[in-house]
UniProtKB/Swiss-Prot annotation:
Membrane topology: Multi-pass membrane protein
Protein's organism: Symbiobacterium thermophilum (strain DSM 24528 / JCM 14929 / IAM 14863 / T)
Protein name, per record: Phospho-N-acetylmuramoyl-pentapeptide-transferase
Pfam (any one): MraY_sig1
Any one GO BP annotation for this protein: peptidoglycan biosynthetic process
Cofactor: Mg(2+)
Organism phylogeny: Bacteria, Bacillati, Bacillota, Clostridia, Eubacteriales
Keyword terms of this UniProt record: Cell cycle, Cell division, Cell membrane, Cell shape, Cell wall biogenesis/degradation, Magnesium, Membrane, Metal-binding, Peptidoglycan synthesis, Transferase, Transmembrane, Transmembrane helix
Length: 334
């Protein structure tokens, strides 16, 4: 790794970390004054009921420093500038969608939040930016590589744009479902973005994407200081949606679309548990899990939050290591 690249990554990570640590004491009292407290579902465990009223919308604590750090330290020459713009549009755009959803729910006290139709329309627009930018602006093409098999498939524009839409919507939803315990999504995000920033992006020579990934890692680490158990603030949809948008952008812009299924397998499992729970109840009247997403099932089995965190973080690390093992084969096939 070149010294300049190392300095960029260190600068971005440390700047975002310091910024998040500095913003916490400002944002937490502000959210309390706005009465932006989290509501807790009635079927949750007694431990969760005690968290009712904890400030939410804390994602701004890491999003703002991470974006600023990226703008300061990311290179802008060649394809880096349009690639960076696309990734930041996906990150900030999803953050704004999540912010609107949070604001309507917790500040305006309208429990349904942003209408599903409006949320989907916004994500369709963001997916269009990502798909068009990747194919037409950056010329990345419409072929995808299947990990493990290392097969390259040419999808063509219509199918590829559909894939990007599914990735954007699915990744944001799956990451959002994983945000249910103190520190859970934060820890998983540190693992995932470390891999995409320090392994995938650097392997492809995309220093700009590496800076974005590292800045998000630094920002989330700073946020975890306030989100660790017992959490003083939750990231809310503003945080989880921004992370989901950034993750989808990194996967598409590095042309590792299907590798995300492996590296982000914990997110996939979480959303599948919700789908299975809903289908089972509608078709049979019975629930497969005590509660979905899956992390709540373990809680209701009597596991402590620490035990659930260790299981999910450990699984996230193992799936990321698996992704690391199959990455060279994918890159060799290009």
């Amino acid at each position: 790794m070149e010294q300049t690249t190392l300095l960029r990554l260190a600068g971005a990570g440390l700047t975002a970390l310091a910024g998040a640590l500095a913003l916490g004491p400002v944002v937490i009292p502000l959210m309390r004054r706005l009465r932006a407290g989290q509501t807790i579902r009635a079927e949750m465990s007694a431990r969760h009921q005690a968290k009712a009223g904890t400030p939410t919308m804390g994602g701004v604590i890491f999003i703002i420093p991470a974006i600023l750090a990226t703008l300061i330290f990311a290179p802008r020459s060649g394809d880096a500038l349009p690639r960076l713009i696309i990734a930041l549009v996906l990150t900030v755009g999803h953050g704004l969608v999540g912010f609107a959803d949070d604001y309507i729910k917790v500040v305006l006290k309208r429990s349904l939040g942003l209408r599903a139709r409006d949320k989907l329309l916004a994500q369709v627009g963001l997916a269009a930016v990502l798909g068009y930018g990747a194919v037409e602006v950056l010329g990345l093409g419409t072929a995808v590589t299947l990990p493990v098999l290392n097969l390259t498939l040419e999808l063509g524009r219509p199918l590829y744009y559909l894939l990007v839409l599914i990735m954007v919507w699915g990744t944001a939803s799956a990451v959002n479902f994983a945000d249910g315990l103190d520190g859970l999504l934060g820890g998983l995000s540190v693992i995932t973005f470390s891999f995409y920033g320090l392994v995938v992006a650097l392997a492809l020579g995309q220093t700009d994407m590496a800076v974005l990934g590292t800045a998000l890692v630094g920002g989330v680490l700073g946020f975890l200081h306030y989100n660790r158990h017992p959490a003083r603030i939750f990231m809310g949809d503003v945080g989880s949606f921004a992370l989901g948008g950034a993750l989808a952008a990194l996967a598409v812009l590095t042309k590792t679309e299907f590798l995300l299924v492996i590296v982000g397998a914990v997110y996939v499992i979480e959303v599948i548990s919700v789908i299975l729970q809903v289908l089972s109840f509608r078709l049979t009247g019975r629930r497969i899990f005590k509660m979905a997403p899956l992390h709540h099932h373990f809680e209701l089995l009597g596991w402590s939050e620490g035990q659930v965190l260790r299981l999910f973080w450990g699984a996230g690390l193992l799936f990321t290591l698996l992704g690391w093992l199959v990455l060279p084969g994918m890159l060799a096939g290009r």
